[in-house]
Amino acid sequence: GGFVHRYLLFNKDAPIVKAVAANPAFVTLPDKNILYPFGLKGVESSDKNIKHWVDKNMAILLGEDDLGPRTKPLSNGQMARAQGLNCLERGKLLYNKTRTKAEELGFDFNWELITVPDVGHDNYKLAPFASIYLFGDVEEK
């Protein structure tokens, strides 16, 4: 999830129709007062980056039981913990802060927040929900 949302932030011409950022361990917020990779301070970015970012069709996909602490230094450091105690909180923060920033700037916001009950930090169990977002429900076809 971390790679996907950052890739779209910094690659305005990314050949993406839809994307899924699942259970990011920490997030890059659209805030120039927070040091990168937790915010945009110290990197070249502008409101145009944010416009292209929020214009992409992207789902923030989160397991509702992804409540455990992260163990790697970058995702368990002070800056990451300031974003929330776990991936569920951090993913919701990314969605909400980015939606608010888009509204402040008058940009369309084409993201979706999808939470999945009874799933933790488990890509295998989240994959069917990502597939439905990306390709539609197979049973509908």
Describe the role of every protein-language-model region:
Residues 17-100:
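The feature captures the conserved acid-bearing segment of alpha/beta-hydrolase catalytic domains
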Residues 4-12, 129-131:
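Short glycine-enriched nucleophile-adjacent loop
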